[in-house]
A protein has these predicted regions:
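Exposed beta-strand-loop-beta-strand "reactive/processing" segments of non-cytosolic proteins
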Residues: 32-79
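Short acidic DE-rich linear segments
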Residues: 1-5, 77-79
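Short, non-transmembrane alpha-helical segments in secretory-pathway proteins
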Residues: 3-38
Length: 79
């Protein structure tokens, strides 16, 4: 039996960890240099254990959803 989300150790404990993973994912997917990506907003959903990071570069914007326990990107949505 595995522990609930509240009892599991989170790999993305801090906002800066979530931002780093989000920037890395965007940079790989869109072939953009990380220094050209700006952080617009971050949010942590404590119920689901997910981080949401809004990033912007050139004329594009995206929201990156990440699982804080597994430290993986679960969704990238352009806005």
């Amino acid at each position: 039996m595995s522990p609930g989300i509240g009892l599991m150790k989170r790999r993305l404990e801090k906002e800066k960890d979530a931002i780093a993973l989000a920037v890395s994912g965007i940079s790989k997917k869109y072939n953009i240099q990380p220094e050209n990506i700006k952080t617009l907003e971050t949010k942590y959903d404590s119920d689901a254990g997910d981080w949401y990071v809004a990033l912007g570069w050139d004329d594009l914007r995206a929201i990156v959803k990440m699982d804080s326990v597994l430290a993986i990107i679960t969704e990238i949505k352009e806005i």
